[in-house]
């Protein structure tokens, strides 16, 4: 499966525009970390792009989230490590590899950064910076859905929180037009 095929699958299965944008943001962050670590950029990108493919089917059935995605992707013969990372992002598999950990920590972070942009008067990623993100990170009422403990597990992939947040922001800024931010 190539990226275009994956993107088409995402657009066919995710009804909400924001979910598609979330998938694009996670993909961008995953690709950025793959480049940094010298890993397969396409594989890492696919894990990010496809990780929530089943969301509309499992929104009221959380125990099957990620598992249904893996089932939906069986016919595409994706590498097992991509499928494992997808399961791992929602606690359905042990986080073993750097890709597993990256997807797990990037998932809430993309939403957190999006919230930072939307709270700025311009609503643009270009006006978000590390200082603003660090301030918002400490505010428990801000972007409640973005699990801070989960985000802080970035250290398990060998990246300190500030560097992690900045790298994700940079990745998302590169596709800001696609994200509408």
Which residues fall in each region the model found?
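C-terminal binding/interaction regions
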Residues: 124-125, 130-179
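Structural signal for hydrophobic packing residues in well-ordered secondary-structure cores
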Residues: 14, 30, 34-37, 76, ...
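Amphipathic alpha-helix face/heptad-repeat signature
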Residues: 22, 102-105, 168
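Metal-centered catalytic cores of metalloenzymes
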Residues: 4-16, 28, 93-96, 166-168, ...
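Predominant activation on well-ordered alpha-helical scaffold segments within soluble catalytic domains
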Residues: 7, 11, 24-27, 31, ...
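Divalent metal-dependent catalytic cores for phosphoryl transfer on phosphate-bearing substrates
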Residues: 37-142
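Long, low-complexity, intrinsically disordered polar/charged segments
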Residues: 38-58, 159-180
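Acidic/His-rich, divalent-metal-binding segments that scaffold phosphate/diphosphate chemistry
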Residues: 1-60
């Amino acid at each position: 499966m190539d990226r275009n095929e994956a993107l088409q699958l995402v657009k066919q299965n995710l009804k909400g525009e924001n979910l598609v944008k979330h998938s694009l943001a996670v993909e961008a962050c995953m690709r950025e970390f793959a480049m940094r670590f010298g890993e397969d950029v396409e594989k890492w990108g696919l894990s990010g792009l496809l990780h929530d493919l089943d969301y509309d089917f499992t929104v009221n059935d959380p125990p099957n989230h990620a598992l249904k995605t893996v089932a939906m992707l069986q016919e595409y013969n994706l590498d097992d490590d991509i499928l494992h990372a997808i399961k791992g992002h929602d606690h359905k598999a042990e986080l073993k590899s750097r890709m597993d950990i990256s997807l797990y920590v990037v998932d809430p972070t993309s939403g957190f950064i999006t919230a930072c942009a939307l709270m700025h008067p311009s609503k643009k990623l270009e006006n978000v910076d590390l200082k603003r993100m660090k301030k918002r990170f400490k505010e428990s009422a801000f972007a409640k859905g973005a699990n801070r403990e989960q985000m802080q597990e970035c250290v398990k992939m060998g990246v300190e929180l500030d560097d992690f947040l900045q790298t994700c922001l940079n990745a998302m800024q590169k596709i800001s037009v696609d994200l509408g931010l």
